[in-house]
């Protein structure tokens, strides 16, 4: 029997990072994984999806995009990832693990034709990830289907594709295959795309996907699937019938916990439910048992990495708790979606800015984009943005929520012109104005701070000067009189509403 300070079950993002950090903390570590070291994210999910989306944006042919994707994912070769662990001192064991009791695990080796390896541990980390969930649709097992992983690593481009599920993965895959010429139909049982996010985000994304050529059915679940001579037919509850060559299932995932032997530790888990954990990522019940990643119900790669750091710190004697108030939620479509923190609530102050209201929004070809910020008691609580590369210019919001920075401070932050950050600037100032009004302090201008109206005039002035010059009508002086900005705008064909 091999004895280790730490045994990690699962070699995905969470498991790998726990193992590396624990090894750096002078712990002896064994990691058990039956599949790819590194998990699905770098091979079958996030990286191939983003690779294909970027190739689509560049206008590449499918063959070139697929080749680039395969290069990015290393051809599903995890030897480099395994070597990194080994060089860090981690014992990598290929096989399927089962907990046999407190402090012991048995591994059926995948490398030694079923040999059983016994391991002893002081701390156990469960990081076995998640698996796709197939919906209860009559006839589903009789038709050609893809999981999201199969859809992202396929060498083939289907002529007609149905994507079932309008969450982040379903929307990304819809845009990918529509961009490369497939006839794509997206079906979502809920009334809108991206269930759980504000309706405006799903509405904007639906508009973008329809413009890309996708057909979208909302609010009617699929009830029956039938194989046909040409492929398949999917029937919806409202009577709609859709023909396709293949059905891609993007209908969610569940924690992969079956067969682990959790009952040997006195842990009872409802099928499909996450492992209950403390804020220290310790599994409720037995001591020295930890969990990180999808098994906890947190389905984002960056959240898995964060939890792994919390687990490793606690195992190494450095008490740490996880704070989930600012975990980003991203959809890497065009336009992209970035959400963080709490959703809108009636008691929250809300600021909403269309990206077309800032100068940068007038420079792009995409007219779709909007930002909403939510604040409570003068502190930012949540945010949702839809727009070009939203994840890049919304990162400061994540920091603001995590650090509980007052909106009065955020409102005084200077953003470069012309950037989408100016949409944040306008929203911060609106939230600060509401906060000051509620506290009876007075307008921002009395505090020596620009108001949202001041900002709008400045944007109006700068854009008008730029547009007039670009139009070749006449050069305006560098110092444009703000009082004349609206009149000058009208003189070159702009309405006052263009900058509101």
Feature-to-residue mapping (PLM):
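Glycine-rich FAD pyrophosphate-binding loop
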Residues: 7-9, 23-42, 182-193
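Glycine-rich dinucleotide-binding loop and its adjacent helix/turn
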Residues: 46, 128-183, 187, 215-216, ...
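N-terminal Rossmann-like FAD-binding beta1-loop-alpha1 element of flavoenzymes
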Residues: 4-31, 170-179
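Mid-to-C-terminal Rossmann-like scaffold of FAD/NAD(P)H-dependent oxidoreductases
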Residues: 2-16, 24, 198-200, 211, ...
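A Rossmann-like FAD-binding core segment of flavoenzymes
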Residues: 91-94, 98-112, 119, 180-279, ...
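N-terminal Rossmann-like dinucleotide/flavin-binding domain of flavoprotein oxidoreductases
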Residues: 21, 40-121, 197-223, 344
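Rossmann-like dinucleotide-binding cores of NAD(P)H-dependent redox enzymes
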Residues: 71-78, 153, 158-162, 168-229, ...
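FAD-site-proximal beta/loop scaffold in flavoenzymes
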Residues: 141-159, 241-314, 400, 411
